[in-house]
C-alpha cells in the first residue's frame, strides 16, 4: 500500500545559488555579462576563422569547433539559470532536466576529446613538420572532429539513460542550479550505486584517455623543442602550444575535481561554485586565451578592422 501512495516525480526544483536579493542582482548582472561575452567571443572567433583564408588550417579548424562547443555548452545552462535567479520556484520538467543534462554533458565531453585532437595537431606540426600536410589531411581532420562528437554522444547517453531509468518518488528538489548527474542521483528512490560507479569509470576513462593523448603529445613536443638550437625557434614553438595548454589545464583540472574525486570529499555547495566556473566562465575564457596569445588571430582581426574602415580603392 505504501508503494502505491508514493508520488511519481514529474518535475524538479532547483535550490539555486543564493536567496539574498543583492547577491541575486550581482549574480544576474555577472552571469548575463559573461554569457554575452561568451556568445560574442566564440561567434566572433568562428566568423574570423571561416572568413580569413590564412586561418584555413587544421589548428583553426579545430579551434572553430571548440568555439562552437563552448558557445553551445554555455547556452544549455546560462539562459535557464538567468531566468531562475529571481523566480520564486526554479522548476524544470522531468524531460527538460534530462535534455539539459544530455546537451551539457554532450558538449563538455566533446570539448575534452577536441582538446586531445588539438594536442595531436600540435604534435604533428612541431615534431613531424615535413609530414604535417600528409598526417593532417582534410580527411584526418574531419575524423579527429567527428570522433569527439561520437564518443561524447555514447558517454552522455549512457549516463542520462541510466539516471532517468531510476525511480524518483520522494523529494524533487535538486541542490544545484542545473540538472547535473551527481545531485540528481541523490534523489533517486532506488540504489544508485551502479550509476555512481559508471559515472566514475566513464568520466575517469575519458579524462585518462584524452589526457594521455595530450600528455604524450606534449612530452614529445618538449623533447623536440629542447633540440631546437635557436632561441627564436624555441619561443615560436612554445607560443604555438601555450594557449592550448592553458585551456587544457583549466578545463581538466575543474572536471577532475568535480567528477573523478570521491563524492564525499567536499560539500555540494562547494561543488556548485566550482560548477558555476566551468559552466559559465570557462566557455568565455577559451576565445580570450586563443585570441590574446595568438599572433595569427590578432593579425586576422586587424586585417578585418582595416578592411572595414579602409576598404580598397578609397
Curated annotation (Swiss-Prot):
PANTHER family: OLFACTORY RECEPTOR. Potential odorant receptor. The keyword Membrane applies. It is found in: Cell membrane. It holds the Pfam family 7tm_4. Keywords: Cell membrane, Disulfide bond, G-protein coupled receptor, Glycoprotein, Membrane, Olfaction, Receptor, Sensory transduction, Transducer, Transmembrane, Transmembrane helix. It is a multi-pass membrane protein. Disulfide bonds join 97-189. This is Olfactory receptor 5G29. Belongs to the G-protein coupled receptor 1 family. One of its GO terms (molecular function) is olfactory receptor activity. Residues 1-25, 76-99, 155-196, 259-271 are extracellular. The gene is Or5g29. Residues 47-54, 121-133, 218-237, 293-312 are cytoplasmic. It comes from Mus musculus. Glycans are attached at residue 5. InterPro entries: GPCR_Rhodpsn, GPCR_Rhodpsn_7TM, Olfact_rcpt. One of its GO terms (cellular component) is membrane. One of its GO terms (biological process) is sensory perception of smell.
Amino acid at each position: 500500500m505504501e508503494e502505491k501512495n508514493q508520488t511519481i516525480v514529474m518535475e524538479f526544483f532547483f535550490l539555486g545559488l543564493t536567496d539574498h536579493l543583492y547577491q541575486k542582482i550581482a549574480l544576474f548582472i555577472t552571469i548575463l555579462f559573461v554569457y554575452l561575452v561568451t556568445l560574442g567571443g566564440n561567434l566572433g572567433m568562428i566568423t574570423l576563422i571561416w572568413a580569413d583564408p590564412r586561418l584555413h588550417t587544421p589548428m583553426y579548424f579545430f579551434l572553430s569547433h571548440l568555439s562552437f562547443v563552448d558557445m553551445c555548452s554555455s547556452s544549455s545552462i546560462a539562459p535557464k539559470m538567468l531566468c531562475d535567479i529571481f523566480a520564486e520556484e526554479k522548476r524544470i520538467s522531468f524531460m527538460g532536466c534530462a535534455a539539459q543534462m544530455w546537451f551539457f554533458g554532450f558538449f563538455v565531453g566533446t570539448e575534452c576529446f577536441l582538446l586531445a585532437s588539438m594536442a595531436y595537431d600540435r604534435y604533428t606540426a612541431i615534431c613531424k613538420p615535413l609530414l604535417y600536410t600528409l598526417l593532417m589531411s582534410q580527411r584526418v581532420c574531419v575524423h579527429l572532429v567527428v570522433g569527439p562528437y561520437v564518443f561524447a554522444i555514447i558517454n552522455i547517453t549512457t549516463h542520462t539513460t541510466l539516471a532517468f531509468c531510476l525511480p524518483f518518488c520522494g523529494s524533487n528538489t535538486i541542490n544545484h542550479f542545473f540538472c547535473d548527474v551527481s545531485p540528481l542521483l541523490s534523489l533517486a528512490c532506488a540504489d544508485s550505486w551502479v550509476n555512481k560507479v559508471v559515472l566514475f569509470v566513464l568520466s575517469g576513462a575519458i579524462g585518462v584517455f584524452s589526457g594521455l593523448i595530450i600528455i604524450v603529445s606534449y612530452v614529445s613536443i618538449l623533447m623536440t623543442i629542447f633540440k631546437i638550437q635557436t632561441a627564436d625557434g624555441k619561443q615560436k614553438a612554445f607560443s604555438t602550444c601555450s594557449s592550448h595548454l592553458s585551456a587544457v589545464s583549466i578545463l581538466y583540472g575543474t572536471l577532475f575535481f568535480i567528477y573523478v574525486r570521491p563524492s564525499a570529499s567536499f560539500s555540494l555547495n562547494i561543488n556548485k561554485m566550482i560548477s558555476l566556473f566551468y559552466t559559465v566562465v570557462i566557455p568565455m575564457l577559451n576565445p580570450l586565451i586563443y585570441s590574446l596569445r595568438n599572433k595569427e588571430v590578432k593579425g586576422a582581426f586587424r586585417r578585418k578592422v582595416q578592411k572595414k574602415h579602409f576598404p580598397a580603392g578609397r
